[in-house]
A protein has these predicted regions:
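Hinge/beta->alpha junction and helix N-cap segments in small-molecule ligand-binding domains
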Residues: 36-49, 64-74, 96, 119, ...
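Signal peptide-proximal N-terminal region
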Residues: 49-65, 179-182
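Hinge/cleft segment of the Venus flytrap/periplasmic-binding protein
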Residues: 12, 24, 162-166, 177-178, ...
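Hydrophobic alpha-helical
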Residues: 80, 89-108, 174, 187-188, ...
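Short, low-complexity disordered leader/linker segments with a strong preference
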Residues: 1-32, 105-112
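Short, hydrophobic alpha-helical segments
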Residues: 83, 145-150, 207, 278, ...
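Flexible loop/hinge segments that line or gate small-molecule binding clefts
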Residues: 97-136, 144-147, 154, 160, ...
Length: 298
């Protein structure tokens, strides 16, 4: 009886040791996480820094980055290259919804987990999505403008990159909010590509065919709003009572928060990066843990 007890305890101890060793091995397993960024702006630099910081708390994680500089064809090639380099998981922010679907589908069908971050594609072939509610952001800024203008005024909108999901969703939410106020009118819309220069180009195009009042400018992001503001000043427009609003609100002197603080912009909606949460999601997927299919960042 005594020998049986000792034998059973020995088996139990061995099982505990085996589980511990296995658990440690899983925790220390090396992973290659590929990150395909559609651009290299300040917002994406912040995300990159947060992901890199997260690797200090997660041993055995190697990050491989590629930036497409707003070119969907370059991003296609970069995704192929990242996958062929032996990536265990792909994080991708598609430049445009339709042009990147095939490459992302290819990765998913090959058994490589795919996290869509910030942007979606036309396909449902992805492992998880993480990003903010862009429609809500556009709606919120529309209501802000409506409140400040007391429901009356002429509005110009500079939309983000044509074919990108944040641009389409922010526009949709903004128009939905403005349409609730009969006294508000969106007099002109032009597309940009998220850069300050494209905001300038869009506003020049608008002013070349419109010389009426502009009470508010909604930029799809802060940089386009800033570019539009500069052109209005250069054109000799009185902007002392014009609202300029954007999206991103980066906590930097020349970011959205700084621009609102010095009254260059009237408002900027925070567009969260949360690279730490993105890393947790990626590792949960790789380690076979439960994870949400859709995560909306606040």
């Amino acid at each position: 009886m005594h020998n049986n007890f000792i034998f059973e305890r020995a088996i139990l101890i061995f099982a505990v040791i085996l589980l511990t060793v296995t658990s440690c091995a899983d925790a220390k397993k090396n992973y290659i996480i590929a990150v395909s960024q559609c651009s290299e702006d300040s917002w994406r630099q912040k995300l990159k820094q947060e992901l890199e910081m997260a690797t200090f708390f997660n041993e055995g994680v190697e990050l491989r980055f590629a930036s497409a500089n707003d070119d969907s064809h370059i991003q296609k090639r970069q995704i192929d290259s990242l996958l062929s380099s032996g990536a265990d998981l792909l994080i991708v922010s598609p430049n445009q919804t339709d042009l990147l679907s095939d490459e992302i589908d290819k990765a998913y069908e090959a058994g490589i987990p795919v996290i869509l971050f910030d942007r979606k594609t036309d396909s449902r072939k992805y492992t998880a999505f993480m990003g903010a509610d862009n429609c809500q952001i556009g709606n919120m800024l529309g209501l802000f403008i409506a409140d400040k203008l007391q429901g009356k005024g002429k509005i110009v909108e500079i939309i983000g990159l044509r074919g990108s999901s944040p641009a389409a969703e922010r526009h949709e939410g903004f128009v939905s909010a403005i349409s609730r106020f009969p006294g508000l009118e969106i007099v002109r819309c032009e597309y940009g590509d998220w850069t300050e220069e494209s905001g300038e180009t869009a506003m020049k195009q608008i002013l070349s065919g419109y010389d009426g009042a502009v009470d508010a400018v909604f930029g799809g992001n802060d940089r386009m709003a800033l570019g539009a503001r500069r052109v209005m000043m250069q054109a000799g427009r009185d902007i002392s009572n014009t609202l300029f609003v954007g999206v991103d609100a980066l906590p930097e002197p020349d970011g959205g928060m700084g621009l609102v603080a010095d009254s260059t912009l009237s408002a900027s909606a925070i567009y969260p990066t949360h690279g730490d949460e993105l890393m947790i999601l990626a590792l949960d997927i790789l380690r076979g843990k439960e994870y949400p299919k859709e995560t909306l960042l606040q």
